[in-house]
From Swiss-Prot:
Gene: MESD
GO CC annotations, alphabetized: endoplasmic reticulum; plasma membrane
Residue ranges of the motif Prevents secretion from ER: 231-234
Compartment annotation: Endoplasmic reticulum
Name of this chain's protein: LRP chaperone MESD
Signal peptide positions (record): 1-33
Subunit and interaction comment: Monomer. Interacts with LRP5; the interaction prevents LRP5 from forming aggregates and chaperones LRP6 to the plasma membrane. Interacts with LRP6; the interaction prevents LRP6 from forming aggregates and chaperones LRP6 to the plasma membrane. Interacts with LRP4; the interaction promotes glycosylation of LRP4 and its cell-surface expression.
Acidic residues composition-biased segments: 71-80
Gene source species: Homo sapiens (Human)
Length: 234
């Protein structure tokens, strides 16, 4: 009996000590309300840092944003800027000839990309157009003109210039070639040396039509005269 009493007292003391330890560990009442509701971050607590994305997982949009950030942070030379961000070259009006409107266009297109369309005469195939325009591009390259060429049809190509102020000089070279039918530049069509065959064929066709019309008229007048003579005889 005495042993069981001592065992009961030991269990009660052990439970009391555990309860006291639990009360000491618990926060005082009202502290939770002062700190805020659970799950709401404290204003003084800085937000967790966003984990950086691995560069190996970058997509095109991430690379574009990174490049844009570099452009903002670094001083980029004017020549390396995109064309739409480059400042326009100042126009010296003292060098403009009022009698030549093309001189104004040359000044305004300086340093800007410009394209012109070139048509090859003689109804060529796309391969022939490639060969002919390649020769023209080579001649321009030897004359220190930076020109890029793109075939856009069986008889048509685009010549693209980095500096549009030289476009009219290149146009003058192209229209002087034997197989150049025409050059389209800034909405203006310039006939080439090779475009004359079309005009000749057109004039020949017009002459043939006029000759046929004249023959028909002469035949009809002769028939009318014959009919008139027959009536007089009757």
């Amino acid at each position: 009996m005495a042993a069981s009493r001592w065992a009961r007292k030991a269990v009660v003391l052990l439970c009391a000590s555990d309860l006291l330890l639990l009360l000491l560990l618990l926060p005082p009442p009202g502290s939770c309300a002062a700190e805020g509701s659970p799950g709401t971050p404290d204003e003084s607590t800085p937000p967790p840092r966003k984990k950086k994305k691995d560069i190996r997982d970058y997509n095109d949009a991430d690379m574009a944003r990174l490049l844009e950030q570099w452009e903002k942070d670094d001083d980029i030379e004017e020549g390396d800027l995109p064309e739409h961000k480059r400042p326009s070259a100042p126009v010296d009006f003292s060098k403009i000839d009022p009698s030549k409107p093309e001189s104004i266009l040359k000044m305004t297109k300086k340093g800007k990309t410009l394209m012109m369309f070139v048509t090859v005469s003689g109804s060529p195939t796309e391969k022939e157009t490639e060969e002919i325009t390649s020769l023209w591009q080579g001649s321009l390259f030897n004359a220190n003109y930076d020109v890029q060429r793109f075939i856009v049809g069986s008889d048509r190509a685009i010549f693209m210039l980095r500096d549009g102020s030289y476009a009219w000089e290149i146009k003058d070279f192209l229209v002087g070639q034997d197989r150049c039918a025409d050059v389209t530049l800034e909405g203006q069509v310039y006939p080439g040396k090779g475009g004359g065959s079309k005009e000749k064929n057109k004039t020949k066709q017009d002459k043939g039509k006029k000759k046929k019309e004249g023959d028909l008229k002469s035949r009809s007048s002769k028939e009318e005269n014959r009919a008139g003579n027959k009536r007089e005889d009757l």
